[in-house]
Amino acid sequence: MKIVSWNINGIRATRVGLKETLDSLDADIICLQETKVTRDLLDEPSAIVEGYNSYFSFSRVRSGYSGVATFCKSSTTPQAAEEGLSGVFCNRTGSVGCYGNTEQFLEEELQSLDQEGRAVLTQHRILNCEDKEETLTVINVYCPRADPEKPERKTYKLRFYHLLQTRAEAILQNGGHVIILGDVNTSHRPLDHCDPTDLETFEENPGRQWLNQFLGDPIPSQKGDSETVMPPSAGSGLFYDSFRYFHPTQKNAFTCWCSASGARQTNYGTRIDYILGNRELVESEFLDSVIMPEVEGSDHCPVKAFMKCQPIAANKCPPLCTKYLPEFAGRQQKLLQFLVKKENTLGNTTEESSELTGTPSFTEGADISTVRKRPSDKLNSTSKKKSKIVTKNGQGNLLSFFKPERQKLTMATECNPIEVPICKKEKTVQKDLQPATPAVKYNKPQTAFWKSLLKGPPPPPNCKGHSEPCVLRTVKKAGPNCGRQFYVCARPEGHSSNPQARCNFFLWLTKKAGCED
């Protein structure tokens, strides 16, 4: 069994079709984050993919924001699925359950934590390596980012972490296994960050402190990585970071890079995408956990886990499945109608239509060649005219079929032909359209004058590190320098020890551009 997690940064922005993208990931369960699609914008190609059943969670606060989706192969159809961590928005039928003690959260807070579309749960039946059936719950999450300029988002992020832990541990205590995977938006160790700076400040981050107590010490893998040394802050939680379980000392293993600075070219990033599993599951069923930096299309790369267990498909998709949404279920029902014969319905419809329009109904043995359709404009005639034409038996008067349509003829005779004047002076027109040679000669000194007056921006300076032309940037952040422009090295961002990375050249441009508030 193979599981993949990927922050796709827009499900509708894939370079190829979604099915081709999913197939290329080669996994039984594919969890996507930051789909950036709300329910009203979800189209059928994204919702219903051949060979997969999908489960979405949409943002209810903003359009084109957040959102997660889990795609399961037909051979891995879950037995239950649920949107959100709190159960506020879930349908009790086919839900996962086990919410834990949420008394520390207010009802409004629970609704706020789930209304941004950041979690989808799917529960599967698996056959473990000992051929025993067990339950596996997969929690697909897109954890919030703590914006430094918005202190309330820092609190929101920590509360989301605590709700995630409450739900995951409650499901685990109820039996079975749990996998948490997705964009956690926190790099755990200095090894997971390209520039951890001061280690003391690094460890003081509240998100890292939560991960310390939530995750347990990884046991050295059987591949000989026994030299693993964990910091004293390592916790004794119920879950393992599966990647560090198998690759505890691997450096430069990043999953997210800044697209604006081109940091992916120099691998100057962070590892914030995880596949976390409960201890027993990782120790007994996991074979490996890897990152996939070769897969492009987002500012994140996928992460993948290989497991020994085999999935057991459910007979029917749970109610949360996207194909059951009315906007997509209705389309499938219409397609089914073309494949099912409905003789009685068609018969009644024919009788009703013949009574309403006054046209003769087709009976067995009738000469079809003698029946003619009435013109469409007769359907809009007044009730008085219909009463004269329709007989007591509901059949139309034969004279109505041969009656000349005076109205159409009158309209045709009243239309006057449109006279289009023909230009007979082609030579004169062509002569006027020809460019005037004296004018071109007259404009040459004007062009030289304007070029001398409007010289344009000066060429950019060369950076001191590489002697290459710099690029011009503009300060977007609010403050006294907002709108100011500056020159920096054109190379991608990277570590200071990397000669191929951007040097530290910086030069303000004297002229200040405008900045919107």
Swiss-Prot record:
Zinc finger (GRF-type): 463-512
Result for mutant: residue 34 to Q: Abolished 3'-5' exonuclease activity
Chain sites annotated for binding Mg(2+): 9, 34, 183, 185, 299-300
Keyword Cell inner membrane among record annotations: no
Binding residues for Zn(2+): 463, 466, 489, 503
Activity regulation details: 3'-5' nuclease activity is stimulated in presence of pcna.
GO CC terms, sorted: chromosome; mitochondrion; nucleus
Site (Interaction with DNA substrate): 300
SUPFAM superfamilies assigned: DNase I-like
Region (Disordered) residue spans: 347-366
E.C. numbers: 3.1.11.2
Reaction catalysed by this enzyme: Exonucleolytic cleavage in the 3'- to 5'-direction to yield nucleoside 5'-phosphates
Domain text: The PCNA interacting protein (PIP) box mediates interaction with pcna and recruitment of pcna to DNA single-strand breaks. The GRF-type Zinc-finger domain binds single-stranded DNA (ssDNA) with high affinity and regulates the 3'-5' exonuclease activity. Required for the 3'-5' end resection of oxidative DNA damage and activation of the atr-chek1 DNA damage response pathway following oxidative stress.
Role of this protein: Functions as a weak apurinic/apyrimidinic (AP) endodeoxyribonuclease in the DNA base excision repair (BER) pathway of DNA lesions induced by oxidative and alkylating agents. Initiates repair of AP sites in DNA by catalyzing hydrolytic incision of the phosphodiester backbone immediately adjacent to the damage, generating a single-strand break with 5'-deoxyribose phosphate and 3'-hydroxyl ends. Exhibits 3'-5' exonuclease activity on a 3' DNA substrate; nuclease activity is stimulated by interaction with pcna.
This protein's name: DNA-(apurinic or apyrimidinic site) endonuclease 2
